[in-house]
Amino acid sequence: MSFTEHPLRRWAVDEMRLRRFAPVAAHSEIYQVVRLIEADERNAEDRWLINARPDFDDWALAPRHGSGHTLGGIHFLWERHTEASTLTLIFPQETPEPARHNYIQWLENWPGGVVRATQIRIMPSAENIDAELSAIGISTDEMVCCDINAGIRLWSDFSIHGDGYGRLLITAGDLGEGERGRIIQRVQELGNYRNLALLGFPVVQQYGPQLDQLEHRLSDHARRVALADEDEEIALLFDGS
């Protein structure tokens, strides 16, 4: 390796490593929530994950990730990061509303504070885009549209709606369910990690000026020590000013 690697680089890569996403059908809906889980909430999360879950026909659980699947096509994904957990539900479009209810309630009552919550609707084509935008509640006044890959196009107003969710509307594109899922996963990871990173900004804004003052005082003190003679230097070393 010809360059010096930051000691935290490997940790950051492992933290952001994309676990395989579930397949996403061309006409489906996704609910994803990222929650900040405090250390004293981890046991509550484990109990909720194991004991409160709705019915799944297939269920697999490891220390940092888990998944569930029903014969009706509902997928659940859970991934534990260092400070947060990502929860994902994927519903086929034909899933009746009563069948969705228990799964969504389970997701919404999860322990921890919500950092990001997104409702994603995948549609086969953009043929009825105006009606779809209206149905999902995306404001055309604030809307952004972009092409991603292989015919996948995304619309969003990047705002939090009355139910607490952001909204994404995505065309299915010309690719398989597995690759579509991986692309949607990558798009979501960008927003999820951005929100997690921004959580530190208020602390920086609050304590940044104090750190600047301390830095100036330390610099001034070092300058005075450098210019002082031996007796003055000893006095300055014990000077708290």
Protein language model annotation of sequence segments:
Residues 1-125:
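N-terminal pre-transmembrane cytosolic regions of membrane proteins
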